[in-house]
Amino acid sequence: MRVFRHNSMVYTRFMGIFWDCLVLDLKPLYSLDGSVTIKDGGGGYTVENDMFVCSALFPLLKGGKRKINGKKRLSHRENTLVVAKHQIGRQEEMAVKCQTKHTFTGLI
């Protein structure tokens, strides 16, 4: 898996697709059944093999919100687990599982 930067964004090529993951740290662990598991200290987070799971470090801004591509969204704690479904050039929802065990969807 290759990770490269362009215009302060982080992209990774996974399964032949370039994903816009907005991540700083990639920690994929593959299991025998083809699913992907991320170890987050308290267990893990498993998804199907057609998704990409990453560990992300989002900077916290004052006011509790930050802008991504002009859209406001909630800020998260560090080491947030992100299931990235976003392809470059398209806007899709992504599910974010925070350390507080709450899950919400947002737009990249």
Swiss-Prot record:
Cellular localisation: Cytoplasm; Nucleus
Keywords from the named record: Cytoplasm, Nucleus
Domain of life: Eukaryota
A single Gene Ontology CC term: cytoplasm
Other facts noted in the record for this chain: Present with 279 molecules/cell in log phase SD medium.
Protein name: Uncharacterized protein YGR269W
Source organism of this protein record: Saccharomyces cerevisiae (strain ATCC 204508 / S288c)
